[in-house]
Amino acid sequence: ASAAKYESNDNYKFLNILDAEGYLIVPGFINAHTHIGDSIGKDMATDRGLEAVHPMRGIKKKILEKSNSQHLSTLMRASAISMMKNGITTFVDFREGGTEGVAILRNAIFDLPIKCLILGRVEYYFDIDRNGQHEDKNVQPIKKSKLPVKVLEIATNLLNVSHGFGISGANENTDSSLRQYNKLINKLSKSDGPKNRTKNIQLGIHAAESKSTVEFSLRRTGKTEVYRIVKHLKPNFVVHMTQATDEDISLIAKNEIGIVVCPRANGVLGCGIPRITHMLKSGCKVAIGTDNIMINSPDMFREMDYIWKTSRSSGINLDAKNVLKMATINASEILHLNSGCIEIGRSADFIFLDKTSIELYPIHDPYASIVHRANQNSIKGVMISGRFVNGSDL
């Protein structure tokens, strides 16, 4: 529409009209799953597989425990800036370290325009593989099946400073502790489950990331991780689902629980390729995350490119438009955000791509061009909440 048309409408007379001729305007990307706390450990354990990021015994845990909080904050801030430069306007972080961990992240990004949902974690785990004492006092044997009162108090305090819980996984929890987390979330949001939660309080958890985690759950509990999660936790979304069974995927779809896939991180860790096409055909809402900074760059362009091309290995092509939706509106709907698409009443979180850039010109299929050709060099501007992110932010 022309500027003159808008100027003649009283509803728009006080607005600045921008001439966006020559630009492709895209909703800002929503990075639906990150761990930016481990930015300090980039590429330190790319050859160690999933054990590197294990919450109870991985090298990541040791790195975070031994690192100075100021160093962590500085590098987390750098990762947030990197995300903005790549068109990410919102990210959802699973923040380890309890209330202190949340405070470190808040301090890192307090003056940056990027939006962040911080999902905190209580550093308390159950070792369902053994009944004896664990060397870590925060890891309890299975016979202690419930979260103790002191831990519940910590969890309640955590909810008061965060946007919800980002739980490690079902294998580090008992059925009882999963129900306790669900009860805490429902109490705060005054609801009885994810469909009825009135406040934007999120409950997310990793699920079916690898064959080993799936087999472990079946061996020790007789149920899949996903079955236990749906029955006892009732989260808003699950992360990964790389090795989920057909029954798992159907269960997630039936219960309207979102899925956040992190395919490049899964590739680095050797966990496989998530069956995204099958998830979508089953009725699941699927979004994208980049996962741990220590093993993967927070780049949604690369993520979309990888998803679009690896989907063809299933023999069923995933069209580029659906891939772009996973990075934008799908994530918004899963997380109940007021962004993710260009629509009146939505937050103005946009990416301005130069249609004449050497990477894109000439554009014959805009969706395909965005998904597998665009990159940081194609971006000429990023807008968050109606304001351009200025040069000092980027």
Predicted segments with their positions:
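Histidine-rich, glycine-flanked metal-binding segment
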Residues: 1-26, 155-156
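Active-site gating loops and adjacent loop-to-helix segments of metal-dependent hydrolytic enzymes
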Residues: 40-74, 113, 127-140, 198-200, ...
